[in-house]
Amino acid sequence: MARNDGIDRTVARNQDLETPDDVTKVQEHNEREKDSYSNQDIVPERTSLNVHFKAPMDDYVKMFEQMEQDGVISTRGLKPDAVKYGELIFDVNSAYFYNHGGYEFAKQFYADAYKAAAEIVGGEQYILSAVMHADE
């Protein structure tokens, strides 16, 4: 969202993830597990500023499978083409945060977004990870 045109933008989207491999790719990006990224907006020197509102306890696919085993969720009866995985993304251009209080304002914004996401999905138990990327 780094357009640098002076217009504040906020995007909230629910991204379907079709396969466990897609989930793994999202995890590698979200948790900064890769050695390099095609996204040129990522500044590796700032990764330590990223904030987890909920840190994953394992890899995303294993956590999902554990939720199934524990009865937290059920995929029984889903159609074969049903989408089992999703990613809820809140994206705001950096200029908005710079103009409204900087890093601390961004942390509070995303803390509030996390609370909203938990309500949207029916509770924190359905969220595998929630992270603010301050390095983008």
Predicted stretch roles:
Residues 1-136:
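N-terminal nicking endonuclease/strand-transfer module with a His-rich metal-binding environment
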